[in-house]
């Protein structure tokens, strides 16, 4: 795999030699009129590898069109394997960019930060952390650069790539269903390297607010609450203060303006003198989104959204500064981050009797008790000479307006995390569940096989309601089940499958497997084929796992 990367880098370097100005990105070389192509990214990576003994480059998978997905590892001493990284006993921090290839400043910013880690002012950090960087996740979409994509975005004027991958799918909706080669590659990377902190770089448009960048921690309440609280209070709040004090950037919790009774409908423009019942509202709790998915893996996650109407150079700069402040926060809190993530894993692998964990299946967004000041901004039109269309540029206006904010979620109905889940042998061998088992294993979830026939107390789910979305989304008609549980004794045949509830990824397993999950195997039509009202859901909740004997792995 490394040979393929080297060959691709060599080809990119050959084609770029005439335009090269050392390790600069395409954005820097063109005064921020253009963004980097795949070849440009590979050229910069090649230069980093050649210029420093601290840099390792490899591929963590392939795109749908067969492009290698580059990964950079920077550390002193150099690490080339996950095992070597873990032996250092340091936080492993992963930053990915360009999941939406029209949102390109993260790709440029993280390559510039990589230079500083290798030979600049950030180099001392390489003795304290392991830095992992995936600068061009949606590599296929990145090759479809045109000025006619995201035309209202304030640069680069030469254009950007597409939001979707080559299959027309949004990679930031694919973390659970894993329909794309890219998402399967990324989850495989997470299983392999298991970073403590994950950062996802985006651009946001939407409402005309007064922030240069907005961010989000984990929004799903089923993540370990200690990780959520730590990210908010010990990382993001000090980072917000540092961004203003040290860099003069205004940053805040991600949101858009929405009327109090608007059902989540967004308003682009708000009149500061007459805001009415406007609120500030975040996006979504579901783990189809990367920051929420990482939370279910017991890891810290931060979403970064540079403001689309800030000019391209400014977006690159604010993103770079934000990631730098995240790095500094991890550096300052290294011991606590490693302790908290390890505790989150251990809390799920402790003896069953000591770990009752309640996890949500229904959720609602929560309002702040009091109104808070949210910065209301505005935009003006500026012409793009390449597209012939107007871009929108943020104005200096940033008026604080008191309003309620909705930036957290809470579970409204929960179930106890079971001792595990049972798939009877007759069902486990059916084509119907093959895709479900594939996905569980792709996610890194442990699946075991019963060694002998056994009697087992289980909870059986009977379907009372099955609803499907009227319109397809991401190639699926999202499904939802409602029903009731009853407790029964089953004779379980040898060869039946058991998914333990006492494994580090149990929160993720719960979200994928549970019949009433709002973003699981049922949601994405992996397991709903043939289900009907009155039928039994084919996966059972195990009540008592003490007597279970499984085959050794």
Regions found by a protein language model. Name each.
Residues 1-9:
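Sec-dependent signal peptide recognition
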Residues 18-553:
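Structured catalytic-domain cores with a bias toward divalent-metal coordination
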Residues 9-18:
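Hydrophobic h-region of N-terminal signal peptides that target proteins for export
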